[in-house]
């Protein structure tokens, strides 16, 4: 049952980003990103990452609601264009859905989906004492490794988000 839930969440995840890529109006693009982010958090939760799923949900979606609330307020149209009002946009949306459907059919026919990355040998990132007894969460270990070993990744990500907000505000202010 859990496999089917993850499969359905994955399909909704891809459909939301097909909707983002063929967005006719900024309102629907933001809606597609919010749905995709929420479903992505659901996929993380289904694999046991409760802490990471909650953090992504709070930080990513909280930040996106602020940014897209501001940008859609700046770029609001009286009659926003929807997916079915333009044949090219509707065709791109349907084409994306057909391609996704064909990929799903191919994956179901072949019976296997190969893992692209192997994460063997990465257990030496965090050294902890095993002398005591207790519960040790792997998620907190991963977050600690991200902030200790991946500090440049965090800095670049923060700078990219800041520049993205500045670019979005400049684009919406100019129109």
Swiss-Prot record:
Keyword Methyltransferase attributed: no
Coiled coil: none
Transmembrane annotation, as ranges: 1-21, 25-45, 47-67, 88-108, 149-169
Cellular-component GO terms for this entry: mitochondrial inner membrane
Reaction catalyzed: a ubiquinone + NADH + 5 H(+)(in) = a ubiquinol + NAD(+) + 4 H(+)(out)
GO molecular function, a single term: NADH dehydrogenase (ubiquinone) activity
Top-level division of the source organism's lineage: Eukaryota
Protein name: NADH-ubiquinone oxidoreductase chain 6
Originating species: Balaenoptera physalus (Fin whale)
